[in-house]
């Protein structure tokens, strides 16, 4: 009997249905000038807002903030109960929104809190070519993504260095500890990324998103970045 390993191939085609409910906020004046393209924010909520009630998606995040509502198209999808954010779903939704609305595809921004902060790190680092800047709030990610890009994927690494990254965390967060953000930001800086920064609120616990989204500087910073 031959015990040497032999080469084989495997292939299977599966149909995938991607569906999501989402809130859409259009800025005042949208549509008045049919040639104008608008910047877009994709917002990912936390674990507590999962389900089928879209009203709770608006509980936190940029849809409550005038500086965001007045200047951006804001897309806020809802993650189903028991699930986490899917990159395939979010990219398909983003593709659809960009086709149906007057989106400036060079000014697409990504942010999210807690579970959505993890989703922001994951989607932003997996597809940096889609975003001008990202702002993960009280999240974390896999530094191995950065290491692999640094040594094996020059194109992705170039996109990391181009993309603005501003992370936020509460210094007293025990739900997602601040070292999660510190590790990600540290790995990016070590890899040569310069447009990356971290804001720690020393006295904040898990809710670091209220201060973050209430600060108009975040939305000004977004608009300073283009892809």
Kindly label every feature range from the protein language model:
Residues 133, 138-216:
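The feature captures the conserved acid-bearing segment of alpha/beta-hydrolase catalytic domains
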Residues 1-40, 123, 146-147, 182-186, ...:
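A domain-start/cap signature at the N-terminus of enzymes
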Residues 39, 72, 107, 132, ...:
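Alpha/beta-hydrolase fold active-site loops
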Residues 46-50, 79-84, 114-118, 140-143, ...:
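Solvent-exposed loop/turn segments at secondary-structure junctions
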Residues 100, 106-159:
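Primarily recognizes the serine-hydrolase "nucleophile elbow" in alpha/beta-hydrolase
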Residues 28-36, 82-115, 128-130:
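Gly/Ser-rich "nucleophile elbow"/oxyanion-hole loop immediately N-terminal to the catalytic nucleophile
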Residues 40, 44-91:
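Active-site machinery of serine-nucleophile hydrolases
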Residues 53-66, 89-93, 118-121, 141-158, ...:
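Alpha-helical scaffolding within the catalytic cores
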């Amino acid at each position: 009997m031959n015990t040497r390993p032999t080469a084989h191939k495997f292939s299977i085609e599966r149909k995938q249905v991607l569906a999501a409910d989402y809130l859409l906020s259009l800025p005042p004046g949208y549509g008045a000038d049919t040639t104008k393209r608008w910047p877009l924010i994709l917002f990912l909520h936390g674990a507590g807002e999962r389900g089928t009630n879209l009203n709770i998606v608006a509980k936190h995040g940029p849809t409550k903030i005038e500086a965001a509502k007045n200047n951006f198209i804001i897309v806020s999808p809802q993650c189903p109960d028991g699930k986490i954010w899917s990159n395939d779903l979010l990219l398909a939704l983003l593709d659809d929104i960009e086709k149906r609305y007057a989106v400036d595809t060079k000014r697409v921004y990504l942010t999210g809190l807690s579970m959505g902060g993890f989703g922001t790190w994951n989607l932003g680092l997996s597809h940096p070519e889609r975003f001008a800047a990202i702002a993960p709030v009280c999240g974390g990610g896999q530094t191995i993504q950065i290491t692999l890009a640094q040594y094996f994927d020059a194109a992705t690494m170039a996109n990391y260095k181009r993309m603005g990254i501003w992370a936020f965390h509460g210094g007293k967060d025990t739900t997602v500890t601040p070292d999660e953000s510190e590790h990600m930001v540290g790995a990016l800086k070590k890899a040569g990324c310069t447009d990356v920064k971290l804001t720690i609120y020393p006295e904040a616990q898990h809710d670091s998103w209220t201060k973050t989204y209430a600060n108009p500087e975040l939305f000004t910073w977004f608009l300073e970045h283009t892809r």
